[in-house]
Amino acid sequence: MTERREQRRGFWRENSLTLTFGIAFLVVLALQAVAGHAEFNEQLTVDGLQPLTFGEYLTSSDFAVDVSENWQSEFLQFFLYIFGTVYLVQRGSPESKKVHEAGIEDEQQQRMGDHARSDSPRWAGTKDWRQSLYARSLGTVMGTLFLLSWLAQSIAGTAAYNDQQLRQLEDTVSWAGYVATPDFWNRTLQNWQSELLAVAAMVVLSIYLRQRGSPESKPVGAAHTATGIEG
């Protein structure tokens, strides 16, 4: 019993970052659903229509588009950041590689092929397509998640937009027609600009500010010009 309890504690401790943010995500998503349901029903009441139940709202295009438009911008942020930091640098930022290390680096630095270690992922030690794929897997998956969530946003957005058009006795549009509307790009670009601003702020502020104990910060006593080191 004691050993099992220790194993459980160890699991929570070793995975606390993922678990904390995962639980926080579910809580905030639930709160968004509650708030969105109330707001949507207020609009339906103003339009003289029957309010939706909470279950009906959760399966509606309005809820889907509100969720997916935020997801796609987050995945885009990480996709651009992952690939951008391969070649782009910022002197003094722990978020950047050292200026002279810009680029994909050689196999020895990346522990690939003949330089793979016993604890390296299996595909890192191969010399075929598997190594090439695995060497770009993080950015590829982030890019794929961005495209899928962007597609989900556009499809859900089309349905939500057409529902609104019907309530106003106006013509509906096709998917291609919706993607060309100001509504779609307003939803999309307002999320993109906020994500890009957040990344730029993190890169610049981490040059001069510190957070003791955080790997996202340089050590408190590190010089402002120190690049690519973490606390």
Language model segments and positions:
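A structural feature that tracks compact, well-ordered secondary-structure segments
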Residues: 29, 56-57, 61-89, 94, ...
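Short membrane-interface loop/juxtamembrane segments of multi-pass integral membrane proteins
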Residues: 53-60, 112-127, 174-181
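Domain-level detector of nuclease and nuclease-like folds
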Residues: 113-155, 160-161
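Interfacial/capping segments of alpha-helical transmembrane domains
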Residues: 34-52, 157-170
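N-terminal first transmembrane alpha-helix
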Residues: 13-17, 24, 30, 44-46, ...
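Short, motif-level signal for alpha-helix interfacial/capping segments enriched in acidic residues
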Residues: 46-57, 103-104, 168-181, 223-225
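Alpha-helical transmembrane segments and their helix-start/interface "positive-inside/aromatic belt" motifs
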Residues: 5-26, 127-144
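Extramembrane terminal tails and long inter-domain/linker segments of multi-pass membrane proteins
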Residues: 1-9, 92-129, 213-231
